[in-house]
Amino acid sequence: MEIAVIGNKEFVLGFQLAGIKKTYSAENPEKLAETITKVLDDTNVGILVLQSTDLEQIPRRLQVIIENSVKPTIVTIGGQEAGLSLRERIKRSVGVDLWK
């Protein structure tokens, strides 16, 4: 399983420096929605990292898909956490609460 990161150039740069290979720069809402859809269809991606503010820019239909996604697990960074917490997402993906 791989980690994918989608966001503006500044957001993905840090992940590139950390060695994440699947990084996608999306500077406008249309490109963002297109790239998210592409990554959601990639069976090799286990975790998708997004900026919280980007979630507000995509269509509501895609937001619902992201909120209900088990694989890949969607992690949002920055601002208020959208939807479920990381703990809840991992619990849904793995089937076990790793914090207990």
UniProtKB/Swiss-Prot annotation:
InterPro entries: ATPase_V1-cplx_f_g_su (IPR008218), ATPase_V1-cplx_fsu_bac/arc (IPR022944), ATPase_V1_fsu_sf (IPR036906)
Membrane topology: Peripheral membrane protein
Membrane found in the keyword field: yes
Gene Ontology molecular-function annotations: ATP binding; proton-transporting ATP synthase activity, rotational mechanism; proton-transporting ATPase activity, rotational mechanism
Organism superkingdom: Archaea
Keywords: ATP synthesis, Cell membrane, Hydrogen ion transport, Ion transport, Membrane, Transport
Protein location: Cell membrane
GO biological process: one example: proton motive force-driven plasma membrane ATP synthesis
Pfam families linked to this entry: ATP-synt_F
GO-annotated cellular components: plasma membrane
HAMAP family cross-referenced by the UniProt entry: ATP_synth_F_arch
Protein family membership: Belongs to the V-ATPase F subunit family.
Record function comment: Component of the A-type ATP synthase that produces ATP from ADP in the presence of a proton gradient across the membrane.
UniProt subunit comment: Has multiple subunits with at least A(3), B(3), C, D, E, F, H, I and proteolipid K(x).
Protein name: A-type ATP synthase subunit F
Organism lineage string: Archaea, Methanobacteriati, Methanobacteriota, Stenosarchaea group, Methanomicrobia
Gene: atpF
